[in-house]
Curated annotation (Swiss-Prot):
ATP binds at residues 600-607. The gene is ucp12. Its EC number is 3.6.4.13. Residues 42-58 have a biased composition (Polar residues). This is Putative ATP-dependent RNA helicase ucp12. Residues 18-41 have a biased composition (Basic and acidic residues). It comes from Schizosaccharomyces pombe (strain 972 / ATCC 24843) (Fission yeast).
Length: 1327
């Protein structure tokens, strides 16, 4: 890029036209040869055996192609131009460098005329070293030829025809071209430089001929010194020509103003109380039209021009704002509303009183209180102005002679200055300026007796005077009058005002002192606290450090317990486990290495015994400061069942020496020395307390590391980073199928030990072995079918297989474990088994969604044979002792990342061979077992993966990076902030790090959705999303739905988006879906249908519901899956306790207000997947009642993304045929973008402008000086400055409430008011 100013122009094109004869041209060419002859002489003077050719000088001895000058002249010849002329000059170092390239061509109408174009590179090209100095003229001219070739032929890959050195120059020019195109200098690279030069010259001439626009006060450009290097200084680059306009009603403006004033957002700055305000800010505010006293007052609360502008626009009444901050059509007065006859009279009187300066809302409410009595209401307002109490239970008192006498006396003194008005008189006041025209003060009889009570006073003028100025003067008059009570005072009041009017006008007083009267709020409300959080008194866990006395007590208790017969009996049972034989080796390895990897086969007892060996070692060694041993498990049920088993083996109860902690449940005490917990819980503790927590532990045992979950990988990375700082901390990694080399290499010098298992023989049966016996047609030919996505589990086959196994076992005890992929599969399988032999079996589900008590049922003994239908939760850790047979479907629901939909999903797929081996091992724990596999031998060998890929490599990294942020923050060097780049550095340190590009995309998405700041700190929303175990977009929808009181519909929509539309794909289904939409888009149409289906199912039964689904072209199974997903999401939302307000009654799916807000919440969740709508020009048709606007076709509406690329609605969308309503649809949110013949948008939802501003946009740039807002650096919104400031502050309050909602269950003061304002603005689009 070129430098700024004249030298900074990207290039200089000079178009010269001259009339020269052919002989002159030839003479010029002849002269141009002189430097070449000179160069020949210089070359000849070299003491060499042979003189190099031009090709050898330019391209080297091995170059066989053409040199750049030849290529340029050949192009000129083909284009019928004259031969190029490369200008060269000699440098101080006696070398040569080219300065420009002159191209010429004959005028086709007059061949004697030549047009010239000079291609001159900017100075910065030389400063950056793009054009090196050359020893000879020939070499310098060829460098210039490359520049000229790039200017006119950069659209071609000409670099391949250039010598190697000149290719590099071409590549440098390509980089510069990208910058020039960004700066809209595309004319530089026109194939025809003569045409480009003429167009540029014409454009410059046209621009110079245009008269400068007339400046108005509103649009007058003001030079502000205090906004340099702020967001205001970068606002001019956006084009507001086609900006979307927004409006905000007077009622909504007042609601927001009252909210912000009541919140007392601005506290006076302690360090500015006794200091002069910033002169530059004050001067800038004055230049913008604000009063000097107001500017100085604003600086008491603000330290920047932007903040001061906000303060002033909120606190200065609209009728005193500078005109640049008001819309062109702004008029003072009261908005017209639909009023009944009673309220109409009050409305009229309120308008009369408000002309004296009081807020119309305050006047209206006061008149309502005092039954539309003007005198009593006016007296109340006057007392309210100075904060005096007022007894409203008064009646009008009879007229007294004192009032009439005082009025007459005043009239006799002032003569023609006094005129009579109703119930009083009006007196003209003289003052030195004419700013307000003629100034008058009105004195009216009070409602109570005079002179015991002061008269009613008001100011008026022939020119506009701001309400707050009137009230400021009036307040001083009322205070003065209060000291005159009991004597006639009109003349005193007049004299006081006349003598001090100049001082009153110059020293108007603080804006805040009279805010009660101008905005209609009580003085007490101004004293409310700032938006601090209502902190709850809930217990916040603190670090627990065990005292020496307690440690000695625990050691003594253990010493006594190990001597008991019951303990010894259990030890003898433990000695039968293979792990016991390796006890000494295990402890030796742990003592000699800080990190030890222990692998053990199924049944070895590693999960129950290793932790006990470690605990017994510390207890027997007489440690004075006993520290806790923590063992992590991937699942809640694993942690609980292991804690119960180990507590039993140690002859104690759970919660004492051995305990557990899982999400929502724990059983630990001060005596707990061995704690089983989930990996996520341990990560949260580390996040809370960092190294302080880890220093309270003696050992961290990470079990089931082979599963390679994200939480396990993150935990291992954290431990690797901190173990060098906590040398006494031991780290043990355990698994049945662990690749020890991977972890040994990762931790450097980690020790390793393998424990052989104790399992009974297991007989394997593949589907080709048992299917024929069960009369099922399933053999090797089914392998291709099973590989397909549409493969479905044969539940009938499982049911018959269960009956067959039961018959084979006969009277032998033992349960059957069936592995299935998901919850819905389990439910269907249970129904199938119960429908066949339900009375013979105790059929139980086992999956992570069940609560602890339901999961524990699987470990109990029953009189009937136990059939357990489980997910992969039962593969490891959980041991159901009486399992003798396993039925393996081979399927698993696995986290996967759908790139096209940008959605994290639980996708059903084939399990790995390692996982199936773990399932098989469940059958041989107590005796010989059998394993039935619902797949063939060939498919197991060829169709299954050997190992399940690490979760970090098969999920959306945006979610992973978000979860990493709090942990990186805890261990960052800055302490309170995450250093930019820390997240990527952490991700690169994982066992299997993802590539940098993937992490960059993830971080970019987090910033776009509003979860991270640019500096990689969590926003308020981000703190919520960290706690939600679902995809970002769906989590965002649940958060906003919960906070705004729309949790129930948000759960439905989240479930639909995580599944798919329940409609079939035929044309009839599209038509029905379009009717259900009613212009509200695809997602809300699906949600409506789901709730209709649910209502019919509950009222009419399954049979009628299935018939209804067929009529509506709905997929019944999909609707069931949506319901299942919704139930699971509902449980997750309840655990987070996010709800701040619940809607009363059932959600109305046909309420315009509800659907407007709900569609905005959807857009907030899908952001930044939002496009702008551009409607065609309106067309009208004549009718008997006048011109009517024609309804436009949907296809005429255009949609543009942030990059101004046009996108199209997919034909399957309801918005493809239904033209959106322009009044409620200025933007469209979409779930998925696909590209076939065009880029299409699927699952669209329309939103209005206010919805986009408040919730749909993640980045908002505002210009309080007059233009409006920029959403996401792309969409321009035109609004008058006061509305801009109000919206900015509302967005700020929303983010603050999100932050506080996570910190405190009570949240912010005024939180409900903030959310109500947002709902109101979105529902009415500001009106």
């Amino acid at each position: 890029m070129g430098s700024k100013g004249k030298k900074g122009k990207s290039s200089e094109v000079n178009l010269e036209t001259s009339k020269n004869k052919e002989k002159n041209i030839k003479g010029k060419k002849k002269n141009s040869l002189d430097p070449i002859e000179k160069n020949k002489q210089e070359t000849a003077g070299l003491q060499t055996t042979s003189r190099p050719t031009a090709k050898q000088l330019v391209g080297g001895s091995s170059w066989t192609g053409k040199i750049p000058v030849v290529l340029l002249n050949e192009h000129c010849q083909r284009s019928k131009w004259e031969k190029s002329d490369v200008k060269v000059r000699q440098t101080k170092s006696k070398n040569y460098i080219f300065t420009s390239v002159v191209l010429a061509k004959k005028d086709p109408k007059n061949p004697s005329i030549l047009d010239h174009v000079s291609l001159i590179p900017p100075k910065s090209y030389y400063e950056n070293g793009y054009f090196p100095e050359k020893e000879t003229l020939v070499e310098a001219r060829n460098v210039g030829a490359v520049y000229a070739l790039h200017r006119i032929m950069s659209h071609k890959s000409l670099q391949h025809a250039l010598p190697p050195e000149h290719r590099n120059i071409w590549f440098d020019m390509e980089k510069q071209k990208k910058e020039e195109l960004k700066n809209k200098h595309s004319w530089l690279y026109n194939e025809d430089p003569f045409k480009a030069a003429k167009e540029l010259q014409a454009a410059r001439a046209s621009s110079a001929a245009k008269p400068p626009p007339k400046a108005s006060q509103k649009n007058e450009k003001v030079s502000l010194t205090s906004i340099k290097n702020t967001s205001l200084s970068h606002f001019s680059k956006f084009n507001f020509k086609y900006a979307l306009p927004i409006h905000m009603s007077l009622e909504n403006r007042r609601s927001l103003e009252n909210l912000f004033r009541n919140m007392n957002t601005w506290d006076i700055l302690e360090d500015t109380k006794n200091l002069e305000p910033d002169t530059s800010i004050v001067n800038d505010l004055i230049s913008l039209g604000f009063r000097d006293i107001h500017a100085k007052e604003a600086c008491q609360y603000c330290v920047s021009l932007e903040d001061a502008l906000e303060w002033l626009i909120i606190h200065v009444p609209e009728d005193d704002l500078p005109t640049r901050f008001l819309p062109s059509d702004y008029t003072t007065g009261i908005s017209v509303q639909n009023l009944n006859s009673a309220n109409l009279a009050i409305h009229y009187n309120a308008k009369r009183i408000s002309e004296t300066g009081y807020s119309f809302d305050l006047c209206f409410s006061t008149l309502q209180t005092f039954e539309n009595n003007i005198q009593i209401s006016s007296e109340y307002l006057q007392q309210h102005l100075i904060g005096e109490s007022f007894d409203g239970n008064i009646s009008l008192e009879p007229n007294s002679t004192e009032w009439d006498d005082d009025v007459s006396a005043l009239q006799s003194i002032l003569d023609n200055k006094v005129s009579k008005i109703e119930n009083g008189c009006r007196v003209r006041i003289d003052y030195p300026t004419s700013e307000f025209g003629e100034l008058f003060v009105d004195f009216r009889r009070p409602a109570r007796s005079y002179p015991a009570h002061i008269p009613l006073m008001s100011l008026s003028s022939t020119k506009r005077m701001a309400s707050y100025i009137k009230l400021s003067i009036l307040k001083k008059m009322v205070v003065y009058a209060m000291d005159l009570r009991g004597e006639c005072m009109l003349s005193w009041l007049y004299n006081h005002l006349q003598e001090n009017i100049e001082d009153f006008l110059q020293n108007i007083g603080s804006l805040l002192n009279i805010s009660a009267a101008t905005i209609g709020v009580s003085l007490s409300s101004q004293n409310k606290s700032a938006p601090t959080a209502k902190k709850n008194n809930s217990f916040k866990p603190k670090l627990f450090r065990r005292s020496r006395e307690l440690s000695e007590k625990l050691c003594n208790n253990w010493s006594e317990r190990v001597k008991s017969p019951s303990y010894q009996l259990k030890v003898r049972e433990r000695e039968k486990l293979p792990a016991w034989e390796s006890r000494r080796k295990i402890m030796d390895a742990i003592q000699h290495s800080q990190v030890v990897v222990i692998s053990g086969e199924t049944g070895s007892g590693k999960s129950t015994q290793v932790v006990q060996f470690i605990l017994d070692h510390y207890l027997s060694s007489g440690e004075k400061d006993l520290q806790t041993v923590v063992c992590t498990q991937p699942r809640r049920i694993s942690a609980i069942s292991l804690a119960e088993r180990v507590a039993f083996e140690r002859d104690t109860t759970v919660g004492k020496e051995v305990g557990y902690s899982v999400h929502g449940e724990k059983s630990i005490s001060k005596e707990t020395l061995l704690e089983f917990c989930t990996t996520g819980l341990l990560l949260r503790r580390i996040q809370q307390h960092g190294l302080g927590f880890l220093s309270t532990l003696s050992c961290v045992v990470v079990d089931e590391v082979h599963e390679r979950s994200i939480e396990n990988d993150i935990l291992l990375t954290l431990l690797k980073l901190v173990i060098s700082r906590i040398p006494n901390l031991k780290v043990i990694l355990m698994s049945a199928t662990v690749n020890s080399d991977t972890f040994k290499y990762y931790f450097g010098n980690a020790g390793h030990l393998h424990i052989h298992g104790r399992t009974f023989p297991i007989k394997d049966y593949y589907i080709e072995d048992f299917a024929p016996k069960l009369n099922e047609d399933d053999d090797e030919e089914d392998v291709p079918r099973r590989k397909k996505k549409e493969y479905e589990i044969d539940y009938h086959l499982i049911s018959r297989l269960v009956s067959s196994i039961d018959a084979e076992l006969g009277s032998s005890s033992g349960s059957i474990l069936v592995f299935l992929p998901g919850v819905s599969n389990i439910a269907r399988c249970i129904r199938e088994i119960k429908s066949k032999d339900g009375s013979k079996f105790e059929v139980l589900p086992l999956h992570a969604s069940l609560n602890t008590s339901e999961q524990r049922r699987c470990f109990k003994t029953y009189t009937k044979r136990k059939i357990i239908c489980a997910t992969n939760i039962a593969e490891t850790s959980i041991t159901i002792d009486d399992v003798v047979a396993v039925i393996d479907s081979g399927r698993v629901k696995q986290i996967d990342y759908d790139v096209e939909r940008d959605l994290v999903t639980f996708k059903e797929t084939w399990a790995s061979r390692a996982a199936c081996q773990q399932r098989r091992g469940r059958a041989g724990r107590v005796k010989k077992g059998i394993c039935y596999k619902l797949y063939t031998r060939g498919f197991e060998e060829k169709g299954m993966l050997g190992q399940t890929p690490p979760e970090v490599l098969r999920t959306a990294l945006s979610q992973v990076c978000l979860n990493v942020v709090p942990l990186v923050k805890r261990f960052s060097s800055a302490g309170n902030s995450v250093n930019q780049g820390s997240i990527k550095k952490f991700m690169n340190s994982l066992i299997d790090p993802p590539n940098d590009a993937t992490v960059d995309l993830a971080l970019k998405k987090l910033i776009q959705v509003g979860a991270l700041t640019v500096s990689e700190d969590l926003t308020g929303l981000g703190e919520y999303l960290v706690s939600l175990p679902i995809d970002l977009k769906l989590g965002k929808l649940l958060v906003f739905g919960s906070i705004f009181g729309y949790l129930e519909p948000a759960l439905t929509i989240t479930a639909i988006l995580s599944t798919k539309s329940p409609f079939l794909g035929d044309d009839e289904a599209r038509e029905i879906r379009s009717k259900q939409s009613q212009g509200w888009g695809d997602v809300l149409a699906d949600a409506r249908v789901y709730h209709n289906w649910l209502e019919i199912l509950e009222t009419r039964g399954v049979k009628k519901t299935v018939q209804w689904c067929e009529e509506m072209h709905l997929h019944y199974t999909t609707l069931q899956q949506i319901r299942q997903n919704r139930n699971e999401l509902s449980e997750a939302a309840q655990l987070l306790e996010l709800t701040t307000k619940k809607l009363t009654g059932n959600f109305d799916w046909y309420s315009t207000e509800n659907l407007t807000v709900l569609s905005t919440l959807i857009a907030a969740a899908l952001s930044p997947n939002v496009v702008k709508c551009v409607y065609p020009d309106k067309k009208f048709v004549a009718s008997f009642s006048g011109s009517l606007e024609m309804e436009q076709e949907a296809r005429l509406t255009k949609f543009y993304d942030q990059n101004n690329q046009r996108l199209f609605i997919h034909p399957s969308s309801t918005m493809f045929v239904n033209s959106p309503n322009a009044s409620r649809c200025t933007f469209v949110a979409y779930e998925q973008k696909v590209e076939t013949t065009k880029p299409f948008l699927r699952n669209c939802t329309p939103i209005n402008t206010y919805g986009m501003i408040l919730l749909g946009a993640n980045d908002i740039l505002i210009d309080p000086l007059g233009k409006g807002l920029i959403l996401d650096q792309a969409y321009c919104i035109k609004a008058w400055p006061k509305v801009v400031i109000l919206l900015k502050m509302l967005k700020r309050c929303l983010d603050a409430s999100l932050h506080e909602r996570l910190e405190s269950s009570s949240g912010l003061n005024y939180e409900s008011e903030i959310h109500q304002c947002i709902r109101t603005l979105i529902a009415g689009n500001g009106v």
